[in-house]
Amino acid sequence: MSYEEKLAKLITHHSLNLKKGDVVQIKAETSAEPLVKAMYKEIIKLGAYPFLRLFIPESQEYMAKYASDEQLSYLPEFDIKQAEIMTAYIYIDSTINTKSLTNADHSKIALMRKTAMPVREIMNKRELEGKFRWSLCPYPNQSMAQDAEMSLDEYTAFVYEACKLNEDDPIAAWKKVEAEQEAIAKRMTGTKWLHIKGKDTDLKLNVEGRIWENCCGYRNMPDGEVFTSPVENSAEGTILFDIPTTYNGVEAKNVFLRFEKGKVVEARAEKGQDYLHKMLDMDDGSRFAGEIAFGLNDNIKIPTKNILFDEKIGKSMHLAIGASYQEVGGKNISALHWDLIKDMKNGGTVEADGVLVYKDGKHIL
């Protein structure tokens, strides 16, 4: 069975658990055609209704470069209609130029994200009602491999292992992950305060009443994290994110944040500082913490400049600035959701209500 066929089966049968009658949108760059075909075929075989939303690699670049604010603010009615009727959504990450937006007008990128918010709000609402589910998965290419500083063969093998496609039964492998991570989610349930310590890091977060979600392949693929959304006005202290991340193709390195009453009041970065400041000023919610999570996928050991993988790095934590997750109790609304990652292997600790629960990347259960 090919990579495309194995991944299509994993996404449709495990991540989305598609059934006869489901209405499924596949959104992807044209460069992902082989995987799109495999997904389309598998969806039909399940008795569901696939429809395609393919786009050229340059589409966002052209919008940022040539579109007026009026054009960038236009939201087609059919986008709203699709969000209202589809029961499942697959986004295939196959960007052939991950740097295409590096020199774009970032205020225009922010406007595009704001314009699309009504669609995301509809999908979020329907997901909470149990009427909609989604999945994000990768299709390896030269650009992604180059970002990860690997050959295409090496990168494809890396993706295989991260997604457990190298296992005889990938679905069974993810079910095992689900059981292992559930112990962590249960341990964290009921916690009121987290205290995160490490290099240039001393941060407290209130997570009282919030749900800890076990992420084991039902949305993202690859997966491997346990997360929640902190109480919006609770973050106090400092944190250094020593693993580089990219957002809309722009890299930020060694991001340092200081929070007061939940809000970022100081932000520095060794690289990408101006961009960081623009993103923090995107809207009223963009300076608040929307997520705190443990990365648990030990098949992902190094950063690849792709957040789909990097936020799951084993023995790491990540905090997202911007939008929180309603399904776990989050209330922060923003067009921004930027995951920033911290290596916890060497001296990182987490206390839950004063009890040490995590040290050097390992949970103490």
What are these regions (language model features)?
Residues M1-G237:
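Active-site bordering "gate/hinge" segments
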Residues S31, T95-N97, N141, T201, ...:
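Short, glycine-/Ser/Thr-/acidic-enriched flexible segments
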Residues Y40-K45, S107, I211-W212, V255-R258, ...:
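Short, solvent-exposed amphipathic alpha-helical segments in soluble enzyme
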Residues I196, R258, V350:
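Short aromatic-centered micro-motifs
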Residues P222-A267:
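Oxyanion-binding "anion nests"
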Residues E266-G330, V350:
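Dual-mode signal for accessory low-complexity, basic/Gly-rich regions
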Residues L336-L365:
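Extended hydrophobic packing segments that form well-structured cores
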